[in-house]
Amino acid sequence: MIIKPRVRGFICVTTHPAGCEANVKQQIDYVEAKGPVVNGPKKVLVIGSSTGYGLAARITAAFGSGADTLGVFFERPGSESKPGTAGWYNSAAFEKFAHEKGLYARSINGDAFSDEVKRLTIETIKRDLGKVDLVVYSLAAPRRTHPKSGEVFSSTLKPIGKSVSFRGLDTDKEVIKDVVLEAASDQEVADTVAVMGGEDWQMWIDALLEADVLADGAKTTAFTYLGEKITHDIYWNGSIGAAKKDLDQKVLGIRDKLAPLGGDARVSVLKAVVTQASSAIPMMPLYLSLLFKVMKEQGTHEGCIEQVDGLYRESLYGAEPRLDEEGRLRADYKELQPEVQSRVEELWDKVTNENLYELTDFAGYKSEFLNLFGFEVAGVDYEQDVNPDVQIANLIQA
């Protein structure tokens, strides 16, 4: 079939398998051009490995370090009549290229919050890898069924303590609008922490330790975003921020548990990028469109693969990691440069419907958004028939 993009709100309901494959190949090419990651990981588990930063972490491990990788994700395959999710096609492409290189690459499709997926993962590590030396935690999910109580928690994106009004960008209508977000209730904050906080990361590491599948010197990292004051009211100081602060608490206990192995646990702070998760945050499309404009002008623009590749080389496996006073690894420093943030702030209130394309890089934002789903990727012929029914060999289905 011939597949065209169909966008509804902050999601594209169609995906293009050939475009997703080309997108993965571009990321692989970027990492390989940088050369090997010195002293990089050899056997890697990526929890949330199919899109965005998690996919970039899997690509960097495999093609920067020659690592065997096991990926965990929750994606939907395509059929002859309907495309699957982008994460499915990304993972199929990743495995194809990894196998061509002679690397081990297997994936588990299921709910990473569940005990069953943790059990399947441990079984697979024992059978195929023995032990892993890096665990990347990169889950973005709207809800979580607690594996012990069965309770279902949903995350919300709201400020804490007071309602907040701010400028936003309606990406469908391409108009600037004022948005008001009501304050989260205590229950909503607690539920968001239950979904997006550090408890599940801790459960994963506890399960892996108990099963004795973490190698000596094993590292683990979970990804976070801090941002600057423009986004603080709805992000860092909001319900999502409460979950991210929980990561900062939980990492301390995880680090202590890995100490006997000579291991380490760190939260890694990455820059704002276009992902399916970030496009759902009301102010992010406008912020990102301005950020892209400013950072491209300054020659410092980066996407997921540039960020994660740099994180591995500089901090996770670098001689002098970039640490902040909280002990987090920082890869977001270019975004937070005062000259970047002050310019974004200066332009923030000047953007109108008329000058949207002139003052911001909304065109670049839209293009990167479509790239997520396999569209507008260079070198892909979108008039060609493609088969949406793509298999992932040796997939372990939970």
Swiss-Prot record:
<keyword id="KW-0560">Oxidoreductase</keyword>
<keyword id="KW-0520">NAD</keyword>
<dbReference type="InterPro" id="IPR024910">
    <property type="entry name" value="Enoyl-CoA_Rdtase_cat_dom"/>
</dbReference>
<keyword id="KW-0275">Fatty acid biosynthesis</keyword>
<feature type="binding site">
    <location>
        <begin position="273"/>
        <end position="275"/>
    </location>
    <ligand>
        <name>NAD(+)</name>
    </ligand>
</feature>
<feature type="binding site">
    <location>
        <begin position="74"/>
        <end position="75"/>
    </location>
    <ligand>
        <name>NAD(+)</name>
    </ligand>
</feature>
<dbReference type="Pfam" id="PF07055">
    <property type="entry name" value="Eno-Rase_FAD_bd"/>
</dbReference>
<comment type="similarity">
    <text>Belongs to the TER reductase family.</text>
</comment>
<feature type="binding site">
    <location>
        <begin position="48"/>
        <end position="53"/>
    </location>
    <ligand>
        <name>NAD(+)</name>
    </ligand>
</feature>
<dbReference type="GO" id="GO:0051287">
    <property type="term" value="F:NAD binding"/>
</dbReference>
<feature type="binding site">
    <location>
        <begin position="139"/>
        <end position="140"/>
    </location>
    <ligand>
        <name>NAD(+)</name>
    </ligand>
</feature>
<feature type="site" description="Plays an important role in discriminating NADH against NADPH">
    <location>
        <position position="75"/>
    </location>
</feature>
<protein>
    <recommendedName>
        <fullName>Enoyl-[acyl-carrier-protein] reductase [NADH]</fullName>
        <ecNumber>1.3.1.9</ecNumber>
        <ecNumber>1.3.1.44</ecNumber>
    </recommendedName>
</protein>
<feature type="active site" description="Proton donor">
    <location>
        <position position="235"/>
    </location>
</feature>
<dbReference type="GO" id="GO:0050343">
    <property type="term" value="F:trans-2-enoyl-CoA reductase (NADH) activity"/>
</dbReference>
<keyword id="KW-0276">Fatty acid metabolism</keyword>
<comment type="pathway">
    <text>Lipid metabolism; fatty acid biosynthesis.</text>
</comment>
<feature type="binding site">
    <location>
        <position position="225"/>
    </location>
    <ligand>
        <name>substrate</name>
    </ligand>
</feature>
<dbReference type="Pfam" id="PF12242">
    <property type="entry name" value="Eno-Rase_NADH_b"/>
</dbReference>
<keyword id="KW-0443">Lipid metabolism</keyword>
<dbReference type="InterPro" id="IPR010758">
    <property type="entry name" value="Trans-2-enoyl-CoA_reductase"/>
</dbReference>
<feature type="binding site">
    <location>
        <begin position="111"/>
        <end position="112"/>
    </location>
    <ligand>
        <name>NAD(+)</name>
    </ligand>
</feature>
<dbReference type="Pfam" id="PF12241">
    <property type="entry name" value="Enoyl_reductase"/>
</dbReference>
<dbReference type="GO" id="GO:0004318">
    <property type="term" value="F:enoyl-[acyl-carrier-protein] reductase (NADH) activity"/>
</dbReference>
<dbReference type="InterPro" id="IPR050048">
    <property type="entry name" value="FabV-like_NADH_b"/>
</dbReference>
<dbReference type="InterPro" id="IPR024906">
    <property type="entry name" value="Eno_Rdtase_FAD-bd_dom"/>
</dbReference>
<feature type="binding site">
    <location>
        <position position="244"/>
    </location>
    <ligand>
        <name>NAD(+)</name>
    </ligand>
</feature>
<comment type="function">
    <text>Involved in the final reduction of the elongation cycle of fatty acid synthesis (FAS II). Catalyzes the reduction of a carbon-carbon double bond in an enoyl moiety that is covalently linked to an acyl carrier protein (ACP). It can use both crotonyl-CoA and trans-2-decenoyl-ACP. It is able to convert trans-2-enoyl-ACP of different length (C2 to C16) to the corresponding acyl-ACP.</text>
</comment>
<dbReference type="GO" id="GO:0006633">
    <property type="term" value="P:fatty acid biosynthetic process"/>
</dbReference>
<keyword id="KW-0444">Lipid biosynthesis</keyword>
<comment type="subunit">
    <text>Monomer.</text>
</comment>
